Amino acid sequence: IYGVMIMKNFTGKILLLASMTAASAAYSVEYHEVQPKQSSIAFQYQQMGVAMDGKFKRFSSQLSFDPAQPAKAKASFDVELASIDTGSSEADAEESGKPWFNTKAFPTAQFVSTSVKALGGNRYEVAGKLTIKGRAQDVVIPATFNAQGKTGVFEGRFILRRGDYSIGEGAWSKFDIVANDVNVKFRITATGK
């Protein structure tokens, strides 16, 4: 009788563990399909003390993110710099020119992640290389992630210093008219399975 009780207890624990593992697997979603129409990459900077806003309308991406294994996450984004939208077609044309983004020579800005660190409370640090105009810089980007079933939303913001990438050459390389700090804000929506 004692042996049967031990066996039943052992079997019960195995079944409980199996059901917990199955439940965990059922709720584990890997997010990999970015939804560009539900996503945005925007920026804000100061020009002569006045806040100016803009965004990029087109980008491509590759993403692999499992909330249960964030350290294995990978992400890369290629932003079409000529898709800049400042609300002024004249300003957009100037920003695409040689002193600024020089989109004929450097059509895209690229970010490639190198590591993802979970901080708790749906907060993460995403480290990687950001390349603009052929100049690569190591960056660490704080981000949050929130899931709603098979849809996940990544949000974050960071400061880009345009001087590090020669955005604004010649007379524009000084920061008295256009500030060096550019606040980049993103919202990336992705689906998974």
Where on the chain are the PLM-derived regions?
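Sec-dependent signal peptide recognition
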Residues: K8-L17
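Short, Lys/Arg-enriched N-terminal segments with co-localized hydrophobic residues
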Residues: I1-I6
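Low-complexity, acidic/polar, glycine-enriched regions of mature
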Residues: Y27-K193
